[in-house]
Amino acid sequence: PYRQKKLDCIVPFSGGRDSCYSLHLIIKELELKPVTYTYDWGMVTDLARRNISRFCGDLGVENIIIAANISQKRKNIKMNLKAWLKSPHLGMMAMLTAGDKHFFRYVELVKKQTGINLNLWGTNPLETTHFKAGFLGIKPDFDEDKVYSHGLSKQLKYHSYRFKAMLESPGYFNSSLWDTLSGEYYRSFTEKNDYHHIFDYWQWDEETINNTLIKEYDWETAVDTSTTWRIGDGTAGFYNYVYYTVAGFTEHDTFRSNQIREGVITRRQALDFIFNENRPRYQNIKWYLDTLGMNFEEVIKVVNSIPKLYKE
């Protein structure tokens, strides 16, 4: 019912590993005619932009870019990072990535302007990270079938816990608050029609994905990490450094743990992976803090001084 004469679907496109492979599947396997959509909120790296350009060029696909007020978005992140540094709280790390949630708002605009209803996402179910909300004191819902939690009661609970944490550092009550809350609204409260996730129907296989992207499309990898996950995200290096320094693990640990549970890799393989993946991404972190106009040494000194949640 979704196939049309010209374009069939919208593909939200970050230039990352999963969205790129999704586009490959949509064109090569499903034989659909997509248009891609990218939301630039100020933390899309040059690496991601190059991969977006490379992939869309090779596959002959149009890329619609909706750019936020980049300077304002970065100012918002800076205000929230300053507030976080005054009272470091692992449960509040999500405030630093709140600006990208308007991705969900503008996909509706793209649907309206193109007349295309179907949007196919490359969200990987193995990416679920319960610990991020867990650091706020929220217990995981293992029956949740989505990467992002939805529903009024769940969101009200989440925001009540976050509000209490915000009181510990009043700097969070700044001009970015409306942007944060409205982004959360579009992500978690608005009705999602004709949204489908490719990897709900197609097996996600890391080796196949990496080989396809790199060998067939000359997809560019990062120079400061062995992983291909989130390498186009300007925030990932910093928040994973914080999690690893304070808690002793990162989202890479949870990702590999999910793979173990699925029987995809062994525990020994997972430990070998995270030994490399959890190493600090100096270049990514430096870019992030420089872009925000923050002093690298001062910020890292605060992070390193946070009391650890583990014993050596």
What are these regions (language model features)?
Residues 9-18:
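Short, glycine-rich nucleotide/cofactor-binding loops
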Residues 21-22:
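Hydrophobic positions on the alpha1 helix immediately C-terminal to the Walker A/P-loop
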Residues 1-8, 25, 29-312:
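Nucleotide-activated chemistry modules centered on ATP-dependent adenylation/adenylyltransferase
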